């Protein structure tokens, strides 16, 4: 753009892109016979960021960036204790899924099908944590849905397409990103068919939801209201293709081991058959023998089982595993409480006997790893309440008696030790 003269005869410079003068913008940068203002630079950066984000969906999952199954397993090991076989199965399944996505555009005679995952294991065994860790590792959108809140479309409750709406919300409504995300559907066992016999009453939260989930899991164009609104006629919908979304379904499947045991005991008959007694086989060992027919008998419809070809079973966590969970993972509970107390400039010591008592209590409550935090929180409540107002406390010691409710934390002052709550 040609230079123009101002009324005071000074030579004004103008942006070659938007035409604004040097007085209308904060900064004007000169190039060979051209100028660009700071506003145009910001606009260019915004365009580049948007294009890079769209391209990043492809680039982030390219072969060079995709971790190998062993690398995925190593990262899972940092957050999840035990469940070695389940971690190996998940690592291979997730690697193959995103490797498949990379080759979607390539024309080939062999079309690779999606392999969704079914996790079977007791409460607190690490099902949800495994799915969360995978999503964080791969840097893809992730959402957890509770199957018990879902109903068929037209009934009170959430319909299955709400799951995709939440996934979109998690990635700021970037459809390309959402279409390569991970959905974890928890409590899938709670929507099992109520009985083998068809009923005249509609099973809107059982088999009906399974039928509704079927299309979503297999791959369909889901219609989602924009920006989290409710569905109503004459409204534009966001179309999301679920074909390449990885679905991981999880559930405790209480009673499934009995179905498996009944089947295996019937087949384990005759000379040379080795049949272990029920006492010799723990639930985890029994669940490893899960077959599609067992899941059908439990109440899942055959079509849904067919869409969940990868089955990983998780065992019940024993005392040793729970103690490791308390101290070993990157974000272990004991490390978290150490940090909380360090913020008060106080050292926290949880003795091995206390860790063992926490693990024993979680096993008695049948809450698995999920119940560990509430046990520690309960034991530390009084001292965390009193500590901010106390002066001179340098250390807090927690032993087995504190966890069992038979004692109080020992407070070490800069001069003498004292028991919490005593004056």
Curated annotation (Swiss-Prot):
Keywords: ATP-binding, Chaperone, Metal-binding, Nucleotide-binding, Zinc
Gene Ontology BP, a term: cell division
SMART domains xref list: AAA (SM00382), ClpB_D2-small (SM01086), zf-C4_ClpX (SM00994)
UniProt xrefs under PROSITE patterns: CLPX_ZB
Cellular component GO terms held in the UniProt record: HslUV protease complex
CDD domains cross-referenced by the UniProt entry: RecA-like_ClpX
Sites where the protein binds Zn(2+): 15, 18, 37, 40
InterPro entries documented for this protein: AAA+_ATPase, ATP-dep_Clp_protease_ClpX, ATPase_AAA_core, Clp_ATPase_C, Clp_protease_ATP-bd_su_ClpX, ClpX_bact, P-loop_NTPase, Znf_CppX_C4
A matching Pfam family: zf-C4_ClpX
Domain ClpX-type ZB, residue spans: 3-56
GO molecular function: ATP binding; ATP hydrolysis activity; ATP-dependent protein folding chaperone; protein dimerization activity; unfolded protein binding; zinc ion binding
Residues that bind ATP: 122-129
Record NCBIfam families: clpX, PRK05342.1
Function: ATP-dependent specificity component of the Clp protease. It directs the protease to specific substrates. Can perform chaperone functions in the absence of ClpP.
Family: Belongs to the ClpX chaperone family.
Assembly description: Component of the ClpX-ClpP complex. Forms a hexameric ring that, in the presence of ATP, binds to fourteen ClpP subunits assembled into a disk-like structure with a central cavity, resembling the structure of eukaryotic proteasomes.
Protein name: ATP-dependent Clp protease ATP-binding subunit ClpX
Source organism per UniProt: Burkholderia ambifaria (strain MC40-6)
Organism lineage string: Bacteria, Pseudomonadati, Pseudomonadota, Betaproteobacteria, Burkholderiales
Gene: clpX
């Amino acid at each position: 753009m040609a230079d123009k003269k101002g009324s005071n005869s000074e030579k004004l410079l103008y942006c070659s892109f938007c035409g604004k003068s040097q007085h209308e913008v904060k900064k004007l940068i000169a190039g060979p016979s051209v100028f660009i203002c700071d506003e145009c630079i910001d606009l260019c950066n915004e365009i580049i960021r948007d294009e890079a984000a769209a391209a990043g969906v492809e680039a982030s999952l390219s072969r060079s960036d995709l971790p190998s199954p062993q690398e995925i397993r190593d990262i899972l090991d940092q957050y999840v204790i035990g469940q070695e076989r389940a971690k190996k199965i998940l690592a291979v399944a997730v690697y193959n899924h995103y490797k498949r996505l990379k080759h979607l555009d390539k024309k080939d005679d062999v079309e690779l099908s999606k392999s969704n995952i079914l996790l079977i294991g007791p409460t607190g065994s690490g099902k949800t944590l495994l799915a969360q860790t995978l999503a964080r590792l791969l840097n893809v959108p992730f959402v957890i849905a509770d199957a018990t809140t879902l109903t068929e479309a037209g009934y009170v409750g959430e319909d299955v397409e709400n799951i995709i709406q939440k996934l979109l919300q998690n990635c700021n409504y970037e459809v390309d990103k959402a279409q390569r995300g991970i959905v974890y559907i928890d409590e899938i066992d709670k929507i099992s068919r109520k009985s083998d016999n068809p009923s005249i009453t509609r099973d809107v939260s059982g088999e009906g939801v399974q039928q509704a989930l079927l299309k979503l899991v297999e791959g369909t164009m889901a219609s989602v209201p924009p920006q989290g609104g409710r569905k109503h006629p004459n409204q534009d919908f966001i179309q999301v293709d679920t074909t390449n979304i990885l679905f991981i379904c999880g559930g405790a499947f209480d009673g499934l081991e009995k179905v498996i045991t009944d089947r295996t005991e019937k087949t384990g008959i005759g000379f040379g058959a080795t049949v272990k007694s029920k006492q010799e086989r723990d639930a985890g060992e029994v669940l490893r023998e899960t077959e599609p027919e067992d899941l059908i008998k439990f109440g899942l419809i055959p079509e849904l089982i067919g869409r969940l070809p990868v089955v990983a079973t998780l065992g019940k966590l024993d005392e040793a595993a729970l103690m490791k969970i308390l101290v070993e993972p990157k974000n272990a509970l004991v490390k978290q409480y150490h940090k909380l107390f360090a913020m008060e400039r106080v050292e926290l010591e949880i003795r091995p006997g206390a860790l063992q008592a926490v693990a024993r209590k979680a096993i008695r409550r049948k809450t698995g790893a999920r119940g560990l935090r509430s046990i520690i929180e309960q034991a530390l409540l009084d001292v965390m309440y009193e500590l901010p107002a106390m002066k001179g406390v340098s250390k807090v010691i927690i032993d087995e008696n504190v966890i069992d409710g038979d004692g109080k934390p020992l407070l070490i002052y800069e001069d003498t030790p004292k028991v919490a709550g005593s004056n």
